[in-house]
Amino acid sequence: HVNRSSVYKSLKPSQRALDDEVFAQQIKAIQLKHKGCYGVDRMTGELRRKGIYVNHKRVARVMKLYKLNAIIRKKRNYFCDVEQVPRKGLPGNVLNRKFSAEKPGKKLVSDVTYLPTSDGQWCYASLVKDLCTSEIVACVTGKSQTLNFGIETLKQLDGKIHPGTLFHTDQGSIYTHPAFSYALEKMGAVQSLSRKGNCLDNAVIESFNGTMKCEWFYPQLGKGRWNLSFEEVSKMVFEYVKYYNEERIQKKLGYLTATEYRRQITQNH
């Protein structure tokens, strides 16, 4: 003889299972907003911002149980030949991989990344990141990499570059052009260039470019050539920059967004 009440009890979900279900829905809502890119640490930080104080172990367990884990970006292997001496007449690697700064506007890093468009061409995005706040402080898109493309990027930095600001890039043709160096000099900035062929010298902004593709483009469009016009790809770049600055919390900033962190430190100074 089987006790009927014990059968019903075994079929009834436990309180823990019910709580997990509710909790999983909260996590799912956050993952949907952030394109499935929040890992355990950032998810825990985001939940706390919403007043939900939980142990990161529970977050990890529920994320795994409900298959809500983040999209993992594969670590890139850097194969770089290192040329220690820059070519004659060019600025050296003044930044020297010191990727931190005490104040906004002290150190800026820049790079151009490219994204495919439906006509077989590319959407080039020129981005500048502040090493203090982690904010993207300039973003320009174009159909080709010209000197003017680089100058337009500098125009966006009006008021953000101060005398002595370090401006670091790789040795791309835009950045080694005398007119670009002169424009920086006129703004009072100190130019710094990566060593030839050494991607690690500009790792922070190169990492951002990879993160943008992994968090924003690939989840929505997959890899390969996308069926989007230049204007559509360009719009997505600007949307990601806004999201990255204003909504995406960062562990190294104490789980604040880049914009929140800048406001906090400028109020304290």
Tell where the protein language model's regions lie, with residue ranges.
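RNase H-like polynucleotidyl transferase catalytic core
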Residues: 72-77, 168-171, 186-204, 220-226
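Active-site beta-loop-alpha junctions of metal-dependent nucleic acid enzymes
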Residues: 121, 139-161
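C-terminal domain-tail junction helix/linker
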Residues: 178, 185, 189, 211-269
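Acidic/histidine-rich, metal-coordinating catalytic segments
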Residues: 161-176, 195, 256-257
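Generic alpha-helical secondary structure signal
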Residues: 2-6, 22, 149, 179, ...
